[in-house]
């Protein structure tokens, strides 16, 4: 009986590891949106807008700037690496003055950034304070909106 217990002590963990490896087999090649057992929460992440974002990414040059809310920067970097994000949540990469200006931004700040970084695409959280600047400017239009965010494009003349 002691011998059976000793074997079970080694066999059971090996079986558990084997089952886990089989469950994960091939999933490292899938993006988080393609995996069946791992899903992004559509209430928090703009997964329903992703097809439009990827289509725009393909039609514009690599490194095209996109204006985005801070919390969506990492999402964009991961899913659409061809865009150059305006900001992301790695705050240590940005100067304190810039972060304060971003948080307290006025229309004049937004206009200055728009001139400095000529973005024609924007992805904003559904409750973003920046939405008022896009809604008030007739040059910007909504491409798509989901529960988490709004995708805008600027009419270029």
List where the protein language model places each region.
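Short, basic/hydrophobic alpha-helical segments
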Residues: 47-61, 108-117
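Membrane-proximal, lumen/periplasm-facing interface regions of secretory-pathway glyco-
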Residues: 2-58, 71-73, 80, 91, ...
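Periplasmic/luminal catalytic loop of GT-C fold multi-pass membrane glycosyltransferases
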Residues: 99-151
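Short periplasmic/luminal acceptor-recognition loop of GT-C membrane glycosyltransferases, typified by
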Residues: 58-96, 120-125, 152
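Soluble non-cytosolic domains of exported or imported proteins
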Residues: 44-47, 67, 108, 125
């Amino acid at each position: 009986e002691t011998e059976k217990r000793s074997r079970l002590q080694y066999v059971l963990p090996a079986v558990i590891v084997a089952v886990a490896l089989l469950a994960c087999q091939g999933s490292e090649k899938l993006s988080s949106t393609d995996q069946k057992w791992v899903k992004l929460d559509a209430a928090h992440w703009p997964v329903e807008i992703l097809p439009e974002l990827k289509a725009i990414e393909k039609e514009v040059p690599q490194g095209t700037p996109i204006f985005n809310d801070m919390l969506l920067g990492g999402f964009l970097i991961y899913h659409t690496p061809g865009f150059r994000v305006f900001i992301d949540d790695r705050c240590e990469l940005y100067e304190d003055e810039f972060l304060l200006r971003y948080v307290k931004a006025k229309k004049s700040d937004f206009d200055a950034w728009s001139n400095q970084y000529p973005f024609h695409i924007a992805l904003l959280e559904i409750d973003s304070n920046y939405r008022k600047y896009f809604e008030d400017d007739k040059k910007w239009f909504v491409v798509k909106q989901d529960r988490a965010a709004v995708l805008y494009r600027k009419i270029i003349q």
